[in-house]
Each structure stands twice: as C-alpha cells, then as structure tokens.
Amino acid sequence: MIPLQHGLILAAILFVLGLTGVTIRRNLLFMLIGLEIMINAAALAFVVAGSYWGQADGQVMFILAISLAAAEASIGLALLLQLHRRSQNLNIDKVSEMRG
C-alpha cells in the first residue's frame, strides 16, 4: 500500500503543474488541459485518502470528479471549436479583443 504522504504529494505536484498550465499558457486549449490535470489531481487525493482510511467514499468522489471533468471537457471543447471557427485563433489575448 502506498503511504498517504506519497499519494498526497503526487496529487499536490499534479495540481501545481495544472495550475501552472492555466496561469502561464495563453492558449485556451492548453488552459483547458491544465484544468483537467487539476481536477484529476483532486480526484487522486480523494482516492488516496479513502484508501488510507479504508473507506469507499474516495472512490465514489473519484467517479463524481471524473464525470464532472468529462462534462467540463465536452462543453469546453465545444466552446473552443466555436471560438476557433469564428476567430481562427485560440490565444486568450486576441480573443479578449473581440468586439460584440
């Protein structure tokens, strides 16, 4: 069994990597990928904590987080496709200059 600290450290590292991707990257697709990494890091923390205390609640929360991430990804990708069709660009600085 993996110790609690190792799993939580891995989840924290993944969360920081995702947060870095969201804050530093200017491309909306990479920002969406960073957000997905952050959601998966939180889900990993739930599984590790549930495994440590011998409860199935962590796995239930993992399923909930994955379904939330799937819904967020599908809506986000649909919006990105529409944005790319209209502006031919996914750079957040260029998109913020759109009129309307």
Swiss-Prot record:
Keywords: Cell inner membrane, Cell membrane, Membrane, NAD, Quinone, Translocase, Transmembrane, Transmembrane helix, Transport, Ubiquinone. It is a multi-pass membrane protein. NDH-1 shuttles electrons from NADH, via FMN and iron-sulfur (Fe-S) centers, to quinones in the respiratory chain. The immediate electron acceptor for the enzyme in this species is believed to be ubiquinone. Couples the redox reaction to proton translocation (for every two electrons transferred, four hydrogen ions are translocated across the cytoplasmic membrane), and thus conserves the redox energy in a proton gradient. GO terms for molecular function: NADH:ubiquinone reductase (non-electrogenic) activity; quinone binding. Pfam families: Oxidored_q2. GO terms for cellular component: NADH dehydrogenase complex; plasma membrane. The keyword Cell membrane applies. This is NADH-quinone oxidoreductase subunit K. Its EC number is 7.1.1.-. It catalyses: a quinone + NADH + 5 H(+)(in) = a quinol + NAD(+) + 4 H(+)(out). InterPro entries: NADH_UbQ_OxRdtase_chain4L/K, NUOK/Mnh_C1-like. Belongs to the complex I subunit 4L family. It comes from Erwinia tasmaniensis (strain DSM 17950 / CFBP 7177 / CIP 109463 / NCPPB 4357 / Et1/99). The keyword Cell membrane applies.
